[in-house]
Amino acid sequence: MKNILFFATYPIGDKIIDGMAQRIHSIDEEFDRWHRTYIEIGLKTFIKKEHEVLDDGRIDIYRVNLFLHVIFLYHIIKKHSHIYIHSLHNYFKLYFFSLRHHNVTLDIHGTVPEEMAFAGSRFFSSLLSFSEKKLFQTASNFICVSEEMKDYYIEKYPFCSTKNFIIKPIFSQNSFSEVQPEKQLALKNELGIQEDDVVFIYSGNTQRWQNVELTIQSMIKYSVPNHFHILLTGDIKGVKKMMEAMSPEKTFRYIIRSVAPTELGIFYSIAHYGYILRDEHVLNRVAAPTKLIEYLYYGIIPIVKYERIGDSFRLGYVHVNYQDDLSLLTQRKSDKNKEIALVLSSRNSDKKISNYLQTDL
């Protein structure tokens, strides 16, 4: 049995919630015939080394302290030919360990130094930039979520152009399903949606980068009597507070709900337009938002602030700008958008990463 060493927090049970955990879990499934060792490194935590065994001995999980267990880390790195690092965040703690003569794979996840700079942490961004360059010099394989991400890093580090780049977005399949017409009709009746209503949807939370306040402002500004707005969020209280602060007219028709991922599909299936307002930034250009792909799959036409989000733009997705007169929009779905979603989601299965790592160095 082949062996691989992952630097990541192994997601167990109900911890498989956020995007990072879902991706780690999904990649792990591609190595189900390998023995996997997971290392989680703490700076102030794990004073005592923790060890857990799962999957009938096929998975070893270690939680260690960077300073107290440095010898253990040295030996376990030396023992493994294949090393897989989930995100630059996990490599930062390995900066002073030599990974030469190993087959190193970096799952990029996102543009971490740029994310830190965007968040205002310029010092930490500079440190991560040094780490990133060193890792790109050392690693052999790079997992990207989009072609845009691949192109960005090859432009940033031209010396990597001959290395192995694999495009591998991870999209949840929870809401990728056909919805029966009778279920759609039942939901419309429940919500009070009329036959001639144009349905707008927002699916997301209240983080600043999701621009939910701007979304609500746009909904209110361009609303007409036959517009119905659905806001799906895990932060009902936060969205309600924003809505109340903007004091929409009584004629403004909307609902705010929190639903399970498996219930998203039926709401998407009755919507014509979906808000996804992202700022113009490299973080968004190289991304592959699950929400956008879900919108496209159901033929929803995205309402955008910045149109170059991931590979959807280069594939020619149908969209409208949030500054257009949205009051003029009519009922409409896009077959082209669904085709694009199928192309993008197929990248999940047409490249099994473990097949690229068969040769020991």
Question: Which ranges hold each PLM region?
Answer:
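Donor nucleotide-sugar binding/catalytic pocket of nucleotide-sugar-dependent glycosyltransferases
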Residues: 133, 137-181
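Conserved donor-binding/catalytic core segment of Leloir-type glycosyltransferases
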Residues: 5-7, 194-210, 216-219
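Nucleotide-sugar-dependent
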Residues: 18, 207-210, 258, 262-267, ...
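A charged, aromatic-enriched C-terminal amphipathic alpha-helix characteristic of glycosyltransferases
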Residues: 19-22, 321-361
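Membrane-proximal helix-turn-helix segments that form the acceptor-binding/catalytic region
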Residues: 70-78, 92, 112, 123-144
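N-terminal subdomain of nucleotide-sugar transferases
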Residues: 1-47, 217-225
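Nucleotide-activated donor-binding/catalytic signature segment of Leloir-type glycosyltransferases, i.e.
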Residues: 240-273
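Short N-terminal targeting/anchoring amphipathic segment
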Residues: 73-91, 102-105
